[in-house]
């Protein structure tokens, strides 16, 4: 069964993870977020109950 032979697939997996970790990840981390986190407490609004016309 060729899929049990790890020789070709292990090197492909290692090269893929190294590419992700060394090339792509630093480029992705330089992007700024569109909604930066703030230190303000989030304001929660109390929802008003629905006024059903038949009750």
From Swiss-Prot:
Where is it located?
Mitochondrion membrane
- Record region (Disordered): 34-55
Organism, by scientific name, is Aythya americana
Q: Name one GO biological process term.
A: proton motive force-driven ATP synthesis
Q: Which UniProt keywords apply?
A: ATP synthesis, CF(0), Hydrogen ion transport, Ion transport, Membrane, Mitochondrion, Transmembrane, Transmembrane helix, Transport
GO cellular component, as recorded: mitochondrial membrane; proton-transporting ATP synthase complex
GO MF annotation, one: proton transmembrane transporter activity
Q: How does it assemble?
A: Component of the ATP synthase complex composed at least of ATP5F1A/subunit alpha, ATP5F1B/subunit beta, ATP5MC1/subunit c (homooctomer), MT-ATP6/subunit a, MT-ATP8/subunit 8, ATP5ME/subunit e, ATP5MF/subunit f, ATP5MG/subunit g, ATP5MK/subunit k, ATP5MJ/subunit j, ATP5F1C/subunit gamma, ATP5F1D/subunit delta, ATP5F1E/subunit epsilon, ATP5PF/subunit F6, ATP5PB/subunit b, ATP5PD/subunit d, ATP5PO/subunit OSCP.
Spans through the membrane? 7-24
Q: Which InterPro entries match?
A: ATP8_metazoa, ATPase_protein_8
Q: Name the Pfam families for this protein.
A: ATP-synt_8
Q: This protein's superkingdom?
A: Eukaryota
Q: Report how it sits in the membrane.
A: Single-pass membrane protein
Give the protein's function: Subunit 8, of the mitochondrial membrane ATP synthase complex (F(1)F(0) ATP synthase or Complex V) that produces ATP from ADP in the presence of a proton gradient across the membrane which is generated by electron transport complexes of the respiratory chain. ATP synthase complex consist of a soluble F(1) head domain - the catalytic core - and a membrane F(1) domain - the membrane proton channel. These two domains are linked by a central stalk rotating inside the F(1) region and a stationary peripheral stalk.
Question: What's the protein name?
Answer: ATP synthase F(0) complex subunit 8
Primary site of residence: mitochondrion
Q: Which family does it belong to?
A: Belongs to the ATPase protein 8 family.
């Amino acid at each position: 069964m060729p899929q049990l032979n790890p020789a070709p697939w292990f090197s492909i997996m290692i090269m893929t993870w190294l590419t992700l970790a060394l090339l792509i990840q630093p480029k992705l981390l330089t992007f700024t977020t569109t909604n930066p986190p703030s230190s303000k407490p989030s304001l929660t609004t109390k929802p008003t109950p629905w006024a059903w016309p038949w009750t």
